[in-house]
């Protein structure tokens, strides 16, 4: 089987859009890219992969191939190939052919187009549906944070929130929590997601309607009639979804969800701003977990510098100096007063040579 580098070598000379798209998707899968960006310019289309959170240019396609490549992707995603002046969204499933370990690797691809000056910009989100889901032990939590997180999952009711910006790994942590819950006694677990990112065998997963016929609040009210033990809501977006989540948490259900705040303690302020009675916070919010993602230093080539461990680059990591990502976490529990610091977690990971000072500055700022 060809490597990602071999697939992309001389790909710009291909005149068959089917082959070119296939090579881009194959290379993206082999490099574990989370996103593919196709950015049109006057004379070419820049192809970039987001690998471990960082964008890398991997290919330049001649401008003459732009429409053919975009049309091929639109056909796969069942989009209107004639519509080039309005944004479109769609998706498709794709499997890598050939022999070897990746022969049957399924890939769910979400596609979005945006008309720009020199054509249509295309972004592909790659979801490896057959890939192994991370467990709590693999997220990167410290022993104390992990113990607090697992303890709250054993509680029969209450609200558990994952907070952080987009792309900070909140959904991955939610799925890890669901997997942990499924290890114990049989539970009726129902999720409401927008969209469903990964199928979880044994879990009833509902998807929010993009036309807003079924929003988070409506879906949550409905699923409570199905006798759930655990409810996972993709995101608490407004006062209606918050009200439904709080009622579920106060009536004997364990509710897991996400919120956009910068740190764990700010989740309380955000909930109150959205309409939660401050007196209900300790009785409702069991735990808020704030997180960020940073790149792991490649263990094969990391070097000890003046400011600690630093990236170098080798064959094993493709010259990047990093391989994979790990979470930075902090916890806050209003009921018990538990409060840990993401800055302390970051410092511990730098000192241990897991990540670099530069990555911490990128993720947390100065």
Model-flagged regions — what are they?
Residues 4-366:
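Short, flexible helix-loop junctions that flank or precede catalytic/ligand sites
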């Amino acid at each position: 089987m060809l490597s990602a580098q071999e697939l992309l070598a001389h790909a710009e000379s291909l005149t068959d859009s089917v082959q070119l798209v296939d090579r881009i998707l194959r290379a993206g899968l082999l490099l574990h890219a989370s996103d593919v960006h196709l950015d049109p310019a006057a004379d070419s289309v820049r192809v970039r992969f987001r690998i471990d959170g960082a964008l890398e240019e991997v290919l330049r396609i001649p401008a003459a191939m732009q429409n053919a490549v975009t049309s091929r992707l639109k056909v796969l995603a069942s989009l209107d190939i004639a519509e080039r002046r309005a944004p479109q969204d769609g998706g498709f499933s794709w499997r890598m052919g050939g022999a070897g370990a990746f022969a049957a690797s399924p890939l769910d691809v979400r596609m979005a187009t945006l008309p720009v000056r020199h054509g249509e910009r295309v972004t592909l989100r790659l979801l490896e549906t057959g890939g192994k889901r991370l467990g709590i032990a693999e997220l990167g939590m410290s022993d104390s944070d992990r113990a607090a997180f697992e303890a709250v999952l054993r509680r029969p009711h209450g609200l558990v929130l994952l907070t952080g910006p987009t792309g900070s790994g909140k959904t991955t942590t939610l799925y890890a929590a669901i997997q942990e819950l499924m290890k114990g006694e049989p539970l009726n677990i129902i999720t409401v997601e927008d969209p469903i990112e990964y199928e979880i065998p044994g879990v009833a997963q509902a998807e929010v309607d993009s036309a807003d016929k079924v929003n988070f609040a409506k879906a949550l009210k409905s699923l409570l009639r199905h006798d759930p033990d655990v409810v996972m809501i993709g995101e608490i977006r407004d006062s209606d979804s918050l009200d439904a989540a709080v009622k579920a948490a106060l009536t004997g259900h364990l509710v897991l969800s996400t919120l956009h705040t910068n740190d764990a303690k700010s989740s309380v302020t955000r909930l109150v701003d959205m309409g939660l009675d401050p007196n209900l916070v300790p009785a409702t919010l069991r735990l808020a977990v704030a997180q960020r993602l940073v790149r792991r230093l490649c263990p094969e080539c990391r070097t000890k510098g003046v400011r600690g461990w630093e990236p170098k680059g080798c064959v094993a990591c493709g010259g990047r100096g990093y391989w994979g990502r790990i979470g930075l976490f902090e916890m806050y529990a209003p009921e018990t007063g538990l409060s840990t610091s993401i800055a302390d977690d970051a410092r511990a990971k730098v000192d241990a040579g897991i990540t670099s000072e530069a990555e911490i500055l990128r993720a947390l700022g100065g």
